UniProtKB/Swiss-Prot annotation:
It holds the Pfam family ABC_tran. The complex is composed of two ATP-binding proteins (HmuV), two transmembrane proteins (HmuU) and a solute-binding protein (HmuT). The lineage of its organism: Bacteria, Pseudomonadati, Pseudomonadota, Gammaproteobacteria, Pseudomonadales. Keywords: ATP-binding, Cell inner membrane, Cell membrane, Membrane, Nucleotide-binding, Translocase, Transport. Belongs to the ABC transporter superfamily. Heme (hemin) importer (TC 3.A.1.14.5) family. Its EC number is 7.6.2.-. This is Hemin import ATP-binding protein HmuV.
Length: 255
């Protein structure tokens, strides 16, 4: 479990994230929403230890991130940044296999996990190809498989952080990707995902954090957060909110 207490981040003498209290629960998928510059990627940088808090704490299983040895932390915490690039023609299986480096599970088990992670990311058909020959969306799915393999099969105490994992994907694979992440959370891992698409967030996330100007504006269920008033206040967007006729979650339509 990952817990944040009174978190503030300063960059270049400016406070870019302030006053955040957050707990990622086992088995939960939490979405982070907000306009450009709201502090979403800054939050992810703080949660993975890349950015040092000016105030507050980030605790992984009640221990500060710096108190974890590198390998032990990598066995519990995986991060998919907004963009991941490799300049070498590694086979797809090797790229996904990088996620197994913190583990000592043996080659046979690692090969099995790589195959299972590729299947979960709907990328099994990419096996055997060179990473450099893939499209942007295919590369994004391979990197998703890599971070899934790092924590596979997912269990309480593990945390997966994803920064816009659907940004390069077509509509079908936006859904298959978020369904894979949702299924991974249901195995017990805690998942935080940064998204821009409000309807995808409504469909797949258990709770949503709405950020505005580096501060939390609202934290709650999709039904609590995705209402006309908060969306107008944060995005300046006039919307209609309806109930999905089949699934029951909020359905947002711009006026």
């Amino acid at each position: 479990m990952l817990r944040v207490e009174n978190l503030s981040i300063r960059r270049g003498g400016k406070t870019v994230l302030e006053g955040l209290e957050l707990e990622l629960r086992p088995g939960e998928m939490l979405g982070v929403l907000g306009p450009n510059g709201a502090g979403k990627s800054t939050l992810l940088g703080a949660l993975c230890g890349e950015l040092e808090p000016a105030e507050g704490l980030v605790l992984l299983d009640e221990r500060g991130l710096d108190d974890w040895p590198g390998v032990a932390r990598a066995q519990r915490l995986a991060v998919l940044p907004q963009s991941s690039s490799l300049g070498f023609a590694f086979p797809v299986e090797a790229v996904v296999g990088f996620g197994r480096l913190p583990h000592s599970s043996g080659r046979e088990r690692d090969v099995q996990i790589v195959a299972e992670a590729l299947a979960a990311a709907d990328a099994s058909h990419l096996a055997g190809r060179s990473y450099l020959a893939l499209s942007g969306g295919e590369r994004q799915r391979v990197h998703l498989a890599r971070v899934l393999a790092q924590l596979w099969p997912g269990e309480p105490g593990q945390v997966l952080l994803l920064d816009e994992p659907t940004s390069a994907l077509d509509p079908l694979h936006q859904h298959t990707t978020l369904q894979a992440v949702h299924d991974f959370a249901r195995r017990g891992a805690s998942v935080l995902v940064i998204l821009h698409d409000l309807n995808l967030a409504a469909r797949y996330c258990d709770r949503l954090l709405l950020l505005q100007n580096g501060r939390p504006h609202l934290l709650g269920t999709p039904e609590e957060v995705l209402r006309p008033e908060p969306l107008r206040a944060v995005f300046g967007l006039e919307v209609l909110v309806q109930r999905h006729p089949e699934r029951g979650h909020p359905l947002i339509v711009a006026r």
